[in-house]
Amino acid sequence: QEVEDLMPHRLLHNIDVVYIGDFPRELEDRNALYSNGGIYMTANEPTNFDMLENFVHEVAHSLESKYGMFIYTENLISEFKGKRERLGALLGARGYEISPHLYGFTEYNEKFDNFLANEVGYPTLLSLTMGLFVSPYGATSIQEYFANGFEKYYLENPRTVRDISPVLYRKIEEIINDDEA
């Protein structure tokens, strides 16, 4: 019921089923995944809010099939890359080194993800990305930038997304207000 109060039902059009349980093959090392009309979520989250965060995040990924060409335009890519460049400068100033061209990739890159998660670590990343990304995970790839912003828009404060990522905010607003959705 809580999800239906949060967002328009039409945004759930690509979701046929939600599975909650133990899915080591599907999830690998993730907490949740959207795939082929289904959302797979681990049952091992500590709180209901964590489950809700996972669900809303995966709803965002489900919207990519319909809205991908609209979402991932040059202006959003430019906003994301600019933030990545600033993150690179912040990390470099603190002695964290990785190939500079990895900051320019918009798609998921396992080497870059491992660098952020394991070498830098999310506690450090959290302090460095405040005001730059709505959360550290949004720095992972442009798809996570979108899904993370969507999640924060619905579960925290849309104004935070607007203030930190104005292009992303406008994309989310336009999807929400799309009568064709």
Region annotations inferred by a language model:
Residues 1-37, 44-48, 72-73, 90-103:
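Auxiliary, metal-adjacent structural segments of Zn-dependent hydrolase domains
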Residues 33-41, 53-54, 58-62:
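Charged mid-protein connector segments
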Residues 33-34, 39, 66, 79, ...:
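Zinc-dependent metalloendopeptidases
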Residues 49-50, 136:
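Alpha-helical hydrophobic/aromatic positions enriched in membrane-embedded helices and signal peptides
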Residues 52, 58-77:
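Catalytic Zn2+-binding segment of zinc metalloproteases
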Residues 80-117:
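Low-complexity, serine/threonine/proline-enriched polar segments
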Residues 109-181:
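Pan-zinc metallopeptidase signature
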